[in-house]
């Protein structure tokens, strides 16, 4: 299927780029790139782009913007990503790069991600926050769950840091296939990537670490299951929401016996760490 590319230039860019990505992700767009001027958003052909944009912050005022869109034939999708995909560095301890980059410039742990439509290349603030948290963990638990795994980058980092069994789940078939390919690219053998939702976890034994980089509403809907699946003393890392949502999520999590440990932010985005 052909893909619609919507190029949105913003003046100023921040914090509106992150807000737009969050809003458009709930309006039919399933791929994003940050550019120097704003963002590129991608959706399947047939989406009413004009109607979707009317439901975002674009028309609330306070900043200037320009919107351009074009149709990308399906066979050109990867070429488009390759043209825009740049390496991501996390505190000089982690490099997220594509195979076509100059890998000799990697700093710290090198993770290779073949850019496709799946979310999670490290460019978005939430993926960066989660990646940083994994790099900074003193000891990686044996069993890790990655919900909304996208490209599989977090699952791959977890294995490279010592996890012995990682379950990566995403609702999108394309994301699951991408995660499997990226696991193979990084010579990972301990990752099981499955397509589905929280229902797949009914018979799973507890995890020492659960990662969930989705959005606030889904996180709240899944919270009881995260609490059930987390072993005593285990860690839950949540992201995919704004700094303004932190108190709401922390208060909600305490209802299920989860204790607040820490919060980290990047621009307007946040990640919270909880323990059972």
Predicted feature residues:
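N-terminal auxiliary segments of SAM/dcSAM-dependent transferases
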Residues: 2-105
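S-adenosylmethionine
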Residues: 132, 171-276
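Conserved beta-strand segments that form the floor/walls of ligand-binding pockets within enzyme
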Residues: 5, 95, 110-114, 129, ...
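Generic structural signal for residues in well-ordered beta-strands
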Residues: 32, 65-69, 96, 111, ...
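Conserved SAM/SAH cofactor-binding pocket of Class I
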Residues: 117, 121-202, 206
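SAM-dependent Rossmann-like transferase core, predominantly class I methyltransferases
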Residues: 76-140
């Amino acid at each position: 299927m052909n893909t619609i590319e919507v190029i949105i230039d913003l003046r100023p860019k921040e914090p509106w780029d992150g807000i737009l990505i969050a809003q458009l992700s709930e309006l039919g767009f399933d791929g994003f790139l940050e550019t120097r001027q704003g963002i590129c958003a991608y959706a399947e052909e047939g989406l009413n782009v004009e109607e979707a944009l009317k439901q975002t912050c674009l028309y609330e005022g306070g900043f200037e913007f320009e919107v351009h869109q074009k149709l990308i034939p399906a066979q050109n999708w990867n070429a488009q990503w390759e043209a825009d995909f740049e390496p991501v560095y996390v505190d000089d301890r982690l490099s997220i790069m594509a195979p076509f980059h100059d890998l000799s410039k990697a700093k710290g742990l090198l993770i290779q991600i073949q850019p496709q439509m799946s979310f999670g290349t490290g460019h978005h603030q939430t993926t960066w926050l989660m990646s940083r948290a994994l790099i900074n963990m003193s000891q990686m638990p044996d069993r890790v769950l990655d919900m909304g795994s996208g490209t599989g980058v977090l699952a791959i980092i977890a294995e490279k840091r010592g996890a012995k069994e990682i379950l990566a789940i995403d609702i999108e078939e394309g994301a699951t296939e991408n995660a499997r390919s990226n696991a193979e690219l990084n010579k990972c053998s301990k990752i099981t990537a499955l397509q589905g939702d929280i229902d797949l976890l009914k018979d799973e034994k507890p995890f020492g670490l659960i990662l969930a980089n989705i959005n606030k509403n889904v996180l709240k809907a899944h919270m009881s299951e995260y609490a059930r699946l987390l072993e005593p003393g285990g860690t839950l890392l949540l992201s995919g929401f704004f700094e303004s949502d932190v108190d709401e999520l922390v208060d909600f999590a305490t209802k299920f016996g989860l204790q607040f440990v820490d919060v980290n932010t990047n621009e307007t985005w946040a990640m919270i760490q909880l323990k059972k």
